Amino acid sequence: MAYDGKWHDGLQFLADAYTKISSVRDGIEAERNLQGFFMAYLSLNGYYYTAPELELNHGYCDFFLLPDLTHYPTKHCYIIELKILPKSEFNAMSKDGKHTKAELQWAEAVEQIKRYAEAPRVEALRQGTTLHKIIMQFEGWELKRMEEV
């Protein structure tokens, strides 16, 4: 992730681990539970400073992995946006009747993360590294979609 920008396997590993340890009870505070899990694991990474809920363009990204260039010649940084819907709502039709709730949530996440990346602070925070914008969408505790936008 830090040197070659290959983020998929690392984030997939975290998503799989979350699926394995989650239970129905975790769904009560689903988004906070998911964010807490990712915060714990991402913070173990020495290549980045993990900044949760960083304010960017009047919104709060779930995670900004800021490069620790003091200790490592990191070449990539990441904004990660986590989205979650209960299993009962994921494929349900939205009020417009044209899209599922998951499709609408994804479209909103794309707009959101692009807006975060355009924030004036981002240029200074990324310190010349390549910025990756990653969205991870969960159905309950299972990862359904993960893409760089």
PLM regions: where:
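Structural signature of nuclease core domains in nucleic-acid processing machines
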Residues: Y3-V149
